[in-house]
């Protein structure tokens, strides 16, 4: 049933050529929020290789302008291509286009823009905007970036307040908030401990964190 017709794009054709049916079944179970019909079944190493091969080409440039995509792997490929964008402004602009279409935790969590590694001060401001967004996975992404880039040498006390201030009911936001605070306890114990001792988090997040 899951087969592209004659109207497939070059990228879709390339993805179907990398298909592993057993992996398709596994992935579909792992990500309950998406329609199994949209999962082709491409393993991540093959997807990363394809991303490396097309990064910076006109094909990739066109693809980045075209969300929403039809398939889960197209979204993951899109995320990998964004992660490879070398300049900060370019990466943020591409994320602003793409984040509203992210519809699952796995695509959200593979987004790791290399342009963010220099910890520009602008990123912290951008994270503030993301965690206040209406879209579930934009908020999850913002919390993930706060965890990835600001729990080591870039840490500030206000980051904990920012994360604690995210009061959302969506499971995939609350899980990321708990992950953030669990990591904060490991990396910034003295700063993070009062948030648990003084019950500053909602009960669900508190319980998941510990």
Mark where each language-model region is.
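Alpha-helical scaffold domains
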Residues: 4-210
């Amino acid at each position: 049933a899951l087969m592209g017709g004659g109207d497939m794009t070059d990228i879709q054709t390339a993805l179907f050529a990398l298909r592993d049916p057993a992996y398709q079944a596994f992935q579909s179970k792992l990500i309950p929020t998406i329609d199994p019909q949209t999962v082709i079944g491409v393993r991540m190493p093959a997807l990363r290789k394809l991303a490396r091969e097309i990064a910076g080409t006109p094909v990739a440039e066109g693809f980045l302008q075209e969300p929403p995509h039809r398939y889960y792997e197209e979204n993951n490929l899109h995320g990998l291509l964004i992660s490879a964008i070398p300049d900060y402004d370019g990466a943020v602009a591409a994320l602003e286009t793409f984040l509203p279409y992210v519809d699952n935790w796995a695509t959200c969590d593979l987004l790791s823009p290399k342009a963010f590694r220099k910890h520009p001060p602008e990123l912290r401001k951008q994270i503030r905007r993301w965690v206040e967004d209406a879209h579930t996975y934009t908020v999850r992404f913002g919390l993930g970036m706060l965890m990835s880039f600001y729990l080591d040498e870039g840490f500030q006390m206000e980051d904990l307040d920012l994360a604690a201030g995210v009061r959302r009911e969506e499971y995939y936001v609350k899980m990321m908030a708990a992950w953030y605070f669990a990591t904060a306890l490991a990396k910034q114990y003295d700063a993070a401990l009062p948030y648990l001792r003084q019950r500053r988090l909602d009960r669900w997040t508190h319980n998941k964190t510990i």
